[in-house]
Amino acid sequence: MNIYLKGNIKRLMLFLILTLALVCKTKPEDKYIWYSPREVISNADKLQPGDILILSKRPTLRSMWGHAAVLNEHKKIVEFPSYSAGYSESPIYAWQNINRKVAIFRLKGIDDKFKSVLFKEINETITKPYGLTFHKNFDKRLYCSQFVYLVFKKAGEKTGREVNLDSNGGGWVMPFDIMDSDLLENISLY
């Protein structure tokens, strides 16, 4: 490979990294109610199955987008946290030492029928691997916020309700896209 081509590739990579860093900082976090993981754990009785948990962004490659998870019918955190884990289910207290803030969201008008279908959709994802995809509706492998988006969307389709949690309609769905959805309310624990 010639020197000219190597230099252009380096510039392109630097441009892409800087663009991604800028994009991940475009949503203000201060318009939401945030809690420490310990506050969430100590107020777990106020959480409901079907609640969406969003972790705040951090200035690292792995966490610069935030993170999304949902509570199943047993109020356990279900998520797609990484390539090595794929689907993961853990008690709420498993997040007690995470050094990030947590925002809690609930689908407006959620009822028992919707929750029942939602939990079936969650259970159908157990064997799917983690993976980044370039289209949010591709469900052969999933990343955290795509998982949340798809289980709510499919539950909505099966209950006759349109539930599109992607607030900006892009090809990907990120945690902060979900947070901005008009279909959700940010839950206060106090």
Q: Where is each model-derived feature located?
A:
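Protein maturation boundaries and topogenic segments
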Residues: 1-48
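Activation targets extended, charge/polar-rich intrinsically disordered C-terminal tails
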Residues: 25-32, 134-190
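Extracytoplasmic/periplasmic, Sec-exported soluble proteins
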Residues: 39-45, 57-63, 110-117, 135-144, ...
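Solvent-exposed, polar/charged alpha-helical surfaces in well-ordered, non-transmembrane soluble domains
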Residues: 45-51, 116, 120, 124, ...
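Glycine-rich catalytic cores of cysteine/serine-nucleophile enzymes that process amide/ester linkages
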Residues: 47-108, 130-139
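A structural motif
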Residues: 77, 108-127
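Sec-exported extracytoplasmic/periplasmic mature domains
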Residues: 82, 123-127, 149-157
